[in-house]
A protein has these predicted regions:
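Nucleotidyltransferase catalytic core that binds NTPs
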Residues: 1-193
Length: 193
């Protein structure tokens, strides 16, 4: 384990399985990992900062060396205020790397003693982003496997009309009084035969 404090900054709107993967792996590397939610007044988040804190607390409750915090302003200044030695950043694709490299170089210019560590999420989460999760959820699509269950439930609560619409569409294809679609009924009939 590396001695010292690392910060993992982001919006986490909402937290995804990719975020949770990096948090878990980062917690094994650093003595303390601070998951730092950026308070960005220029964005219109789906979840309030308080809701994101609550979700992240729930998701990291078993990780003793993980702390949830918020900040605004420069990431470098926030890191210095905690005596952090490292910024942890997730990289999913080349486009992420180009952006993150520019940020890391700027951060190094502002604070030469602060290192940036790039970490790739597990392959199964390499395409998952909060933005894509929001888009799928807002369209009433399934987000199971993209986000932890607690986040899926919060999305469902937040976007209830979209989920009701999806459920209503599914009901259109079910036989009255059975709750089973004609296709599923046919598969069951073939299995019995």
């Amino acid at each position: 384990m590396h001695r010292g404090i690392a910060i993992y900054p982001g919006s986490f709107d909402p937290p995804t399985n990719g975020h949770l993967d990096l948090i878990g792996r980062g917690a094994k590397i650093f003595e303390q990992l601070v998951v730092a939610i950026l308070r960005n007044s220029e964005k219109s988040p789906m979840f309030t900062v308080g809701e994101r804190i609550e979700m992240l607390h729930s998701l990291t409750a078993e990780m003793e060396n993980v702390r949830i915090d918020t900040f605004n302003g420069l990431t470098v200044e926030y890191a210095k205020s905690l005596d952090a030695t490292c910024i942890l950043r997730g990289i999913r694709a080349i486009s992420d790397y180009e952006y993150e490299l520019q940020m890391a170089l700027m951060n190094r210019k502002l604070e030469p003693t602060l290192e940036t560590v790039f970490m790739m999420p597990a392959d199964k989460y390499s395409y998952v982003s909060s933005r894509l999760v929001r888009e799928v959820a807002q369209a009433g699509g399934p987000v199971r496997g993209l986000v932890p269950e607690v986040v899926e439930e919060k999305l469902r609560e937040k976007l209830d009309p979209a989920y009701k619409l999806r459920d209503a569409r599914m009901l259109e294809f079910m036989e009255p009084g059975t709750g089973i679609s004609p296709e599923r009924k046919e598969r069951k009939r073939k299995k019995k035969a």
